[in-house]
Amino acid sequence: ECATKNKRCADWAGPWCCDGLYCSCRSYPGCMCRPSS
C-alpha cells in the first residue's frame, strides 16, 4: 500500500509514495510524500 500526498514515507524502509509522488525528507519531523512535478 502506497503513501499518498503529504503522508509520511521512508526512503529506505517504506511506506513508499504512490505514483507521481516522491519522498521528501526536508520537512520535520520525518519524510513526506510530495508531487514530483
Swiss-Prot record:
Matching Pfam families: Toxin_7
Keywords (A to Z) from UniProt: Amidation, Disulfide bond, Ion channel impairing toxin, Knottin, Neurotoxin, Presynaptic neurotoxin, Secreted, Toxin, Voltage-gated sodium channel impairing toxin
Tissue expression from the record: Expressed by the venom gland.
Modified residues (Serine amide): 37
Family under the similarity heading: Belongs to the neurotoxin 07 (Beta/delta-agtx) family. 01 (aga-2) subfamily.
A GO-annotated cellular component: host cell presynaptic membrane
Name of this chain's protein: Mu-agatoxin-Aa1b
GO molecular function: sodium channel regulator activity; toxin activity
Record InterPro entries: Beta/delta-agatoxin_fam
Domain of life of the source: Eukaryota
Subcellular location: Secreted
Role summary: Insecticidal neurotoxin that induces an irreversible spastic paralysis when injected into insects. Modifies presynaptic voltage-gated sodium channels (Nav), causing them to open at the normal resting potential of the nerve. This leads to spontaneous release of neurotransmitter and repetitive action potentials in motor neurons.
Disulfide bonds: 2-18, 9-23, 17-33, 25-31
Domain remark in the UniProt entry: The presence of a 'disulfide through disulfide knot' structurally defines this protein as a knottin.
